[in-house]
């Protein structure tokens, strides 16, 4: 089994400034409709999900798609962080993020989110199956 990790921390004020400056244009470019509904305008929650997207991108070994991005990048909305019935955060991948996870033989991604003292943080951990490890060339 192989384990991949990613971590990100963001100042909540940075996300607040982006929302104030760009409004719905920013929010709809970065977050899925389900994330927008779940966060209900709470900046702390939006910031935690920003950190989640960055943390997952790091474990995938890619950047986030924006101006001047490389072929090894994913769109922000390709990484969606919602909650399960028990309130635990979950990650759903689509598009280029899902394709990259398949390349890495990732079976599951767990994520933890937190925000306090003006910061939001996310830690993401992904694992592959033992069978996928046997297929790797090293």
Curated annotation (Swiss-Prot):
GO molecular function, one term: magnesium ion binding
Keywords for this protein: Cytoplasm, Fatty acid biosynthesis, Fatty acid metabolism, Lipid biosynthesis, Lipid metabolism, Magnesium, Metal-binding, Transferase
Gene3D superfamilies: 4'-phosphopantetheinyl transferase domain
One of the Pfam families matching this protein, by short name: ACPS
Enzyme class label: transferase
Swiss-Prot/TrEMBL cofactor(s): Mg(2+)
Any one biological process term the GO annotation gives: fatty acid biosynthetic process
Catalytic activity field: apo-[ACP] + CoA = holo-[ACP] + adenosine 3',5'-bisphosphate + H(+)
Subcellular location, record wording: Cytoplasm
Record InterPro entries: 4-PPantetheinyl_Trfase_dom, 4-PPantetheinyl_Trfase_dom_sf, ACPS, Ppantetheine-prot_Trfase_dom
Alphabetized SUPFAM superfamilies for the sequence: 4'-phosphopantetheinyl transferase
Protein residues bound to Mg(2+): 8, 54
Function: Transfers the 4'-phosphopantetheine moiety from coenzyme A to a Ser of acyl-carrier-protein.
Similarity comment: Belongs to the P-Pant transferase superfamily. AcpS family.
Family annotation (HAMAP family): AcpS
Name recorded for this polypeptide: Holo-[acyl-carrier-protein] synthase
Organism field: Roseiflexus sp. (strain RS-1)
């Amino acid at each position: 089994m192989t384990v991949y990790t990613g971590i990100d921390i963001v100042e909540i004020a940075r996300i607040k400034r982006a929302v104030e400056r760009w409004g719905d244009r920013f929010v709809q470019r970065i977050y899925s409709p389900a994330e927008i509904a779940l966060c209900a305008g709470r900046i702390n929650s939006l910031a935690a999900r920003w950190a989640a997207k960055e943390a997952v991108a790091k474990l995938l070994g890619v950047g986030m798609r924006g101006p001047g991005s490389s072929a090894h990048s994913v769109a922000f909305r390709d990484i969606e962080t919602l909650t399960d019935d028990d309130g635990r955060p979950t990650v759903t991948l689509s598009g280029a993020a899902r394709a990259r996870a398949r390349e890495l033989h990732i079976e599951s991604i767990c994520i933890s989110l937190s925000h306090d003292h003006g910061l939001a943080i996310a830690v993401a951990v992904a694992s592959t199956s033992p069978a996928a490890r046997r297929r790797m060339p090293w």
